[in-house]
UniProtKB/Swiss-Prot annotation:
GO cellular component, one term: host cell endomembrane system
Membrane-topology descriptor: Peripheral membrane protein
Protein name per the record: Membrane-associated protein VP24
Subcellular location per the Swiss-Prot or TrEMBL entry: Virion membrane; Host cell membrane; Host endomembrane system
Gene Ontology BP term (one): viral process
GO molecular function terms listed in the Swiss-Prot or TrEMBL record: structural constituent of virion
Gene expressing this chain: VP24
Pfam family of the protein (one): Filo_VP24
Species per Swiss-Prot/TrEMBL record: Lake Victoria marburgvirus (strain Popp-67) (MARV)
Length: 253
């Protein structure tokens, strides 16, 4: 399907505000405790992350679940019935979301080589590490991550959030509820549920016998509350309410 694009829009004139942007903020992950959760700063984003859903995820992973929630356990059996699955904190699930948002830009857009290299390094760092910073040569940042490129990068992340809000909550009407991406050695699935977005990362192994790729039983997953991303999204203003998109009482999360 043909899509509208601003690929060849000329960059706006550099203003006082854009000159003062902290380009190094994309290479720093600042996490601070807050009341009931955490505050995360990355790029020009400030995320307020509640500790929502952690207790529920751990309860669903236990064997003491009310009958009404068994359907949820069965649907996500590779998460809740799998002894090799691990629950991660919401701020780590958010970090994975941001890494995927950058990877989506890297894979789908015709970026200039130097800028693409920076986007690649940032996405790999967010997806594969938990460190608070990554060192990128100031020369590279100065040449390839200009103020205008920085704004394009941040806008791309917001566009990815917008794409996530077009998903429907897991449903029985055949409407899309997940975004999936396969990277080197791992598959990431982002699924919209009642409470927000369920993020899972599964390792992809190669069978020694035949060289075919198979999904490993080892999986990490976490939940990002909807409100964390909604304040950075421009979706759903004035749109009609679609209950399939917003709520499904058949799932527990």
């Amino acid at each position: 399907m043909a899509e509208l694009s601003t690929r060849y829009n000329l960059p706006a004139n550099v203003t006082e505000k854009s000159i003062n942007l902290d380009l190094n903020s994309t290479a720093r992950w600042i996490k601070e405790p807050s009341v009931g959760g955490w505050t995360v700063k990355w790029g020009n984003f400030v995320f307020h992350i509640p500790n929502t859903g952690m207790a529920l995820l751990h309860h669903l992973k236990s064997n003491f679940v009310v009958p009404e929630w068994q359907q949820t356990r069965n649907l996500f059996s590779h998460l809740f019935k799998n002894p090799k699955s691990t629950i991660i904190e919401p701020f780590l699930a958010l970090r994975i979301l941001l890494g995927v948002a950058l990877k989506d830009q890297e894979l789908q857009q015709s970026l200039i080589p130097g800028f693409r290299s920076i986007v690649h390094m940032l996405s790999e760092w967010l997806l594969l590490e938990v460190t608070s910073a990554i060192h990128i040569s100031p020369n590279l940042l100065g040449i390839y991550l200009t103020s205008d490129m920085f704004k394009i990068l941040m806008a791309g992340v917001k566009n990815f959030f917008n794409k996530m809000f077009t998903l429907h909550v897991v449903n029985d009407h055949g409407k899309p509820s997940s975004i999936e991406i396969k990277l080197t050695g791992q598959q990431i699935i982002i699924t919209r549920v009642n409470m927000g977005f369920l993020v899972e990362v599964r390792r992809i192994d190669i069978e020694p016998c035949c060289g075919e790729t198979v999904l490993s039983e080892s999986v990490v997953f976490g939940l990002v509350a909807e409100a964390v991303l909604r304040e950075h999204s421009q979706m759903e203003k004035g749109q009609p309410l679609d209950l399939t998109q917003y709520m499904n009482s058949k799932i527990a999360i």
